[in-house]
Amino acid sequence: MAGVERMLEWSPSLGTTDELWRRWLGSPAVRAYETGRTGRDAFADAIIAEFGLPVDAETFLGEFAWWPRSLHPDAGALLASLASRYRLASLSNTNELHWHRFARDWDLPALFHHNFPSFMVGKLKPDADYFEHVLDALGIAADRALFVDDNRINVEAARAVGLHARQVPRFEALAPALAELGIHAATPGSAR
């Protein structure tokens, strides 16, 4: 998330990336916005106050809208190669502003059989009830599901619920991580 770097630039006293993630995931303002309980203006005002950011709401929202940078160019091919053999679901801590970009700019929701954006579901990772909600909605047991995420906190939470979980820090590490589990995914230029 580009926003982590930006938040640390705005306010270096926020600490390390892990410390900022812990604060972000536990933030009342983030939780309210990314579970659909508040609007973007109230969110911006609350984040600025909570994190002591030296910017106004307009500046924050202008940058926040672009924190998701892009979709990796091989993501569609990799997910398509998996979708023919596995049921794919996205669990995303997100908000209406970012989800609109995911759909409009990258058609991301179409790459999954099921989507569980937090602002629509009303739940957030790393909370156990988010994982449990998704498992119930899909009708599968935790030990029959694999969860991958770039955030260690979310991976540990998924494991605590009983899911198989892997931390994958960047897209290029995804196919090798899946291959270690016997799941072979194709990307352009790779043999399947």
Summary of predicted features, one role per range:
Residues 2-6, 28, 70, 97, ...:
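Short alpha-helical
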Residues 1-26, 50-54, 160:
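Active-site neighborhood of HAD-like aspartate-dependent phosphohydrolases
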Residues 5-9, 28, 42, 46, ...:
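Alpha-helical elements of Rossmann-like donor-binding domains used by nucleotide-donor carbohydrate transfer enzymes
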Residues 58-89, 100, 128:
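Short, acidic loop-to-helix structural element flanking the phosphoryl-transfer center
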Residues 30-60:
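A metal-dependent, Asp-based hydrolase signature
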Residues 27, 84-85, 111:
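Structured helix-beta-strand junction loops
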Residues 95-96, 100-192:
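Asp-based, Mg2+/Mn2+-dependent phosphohydrolase catalytic module
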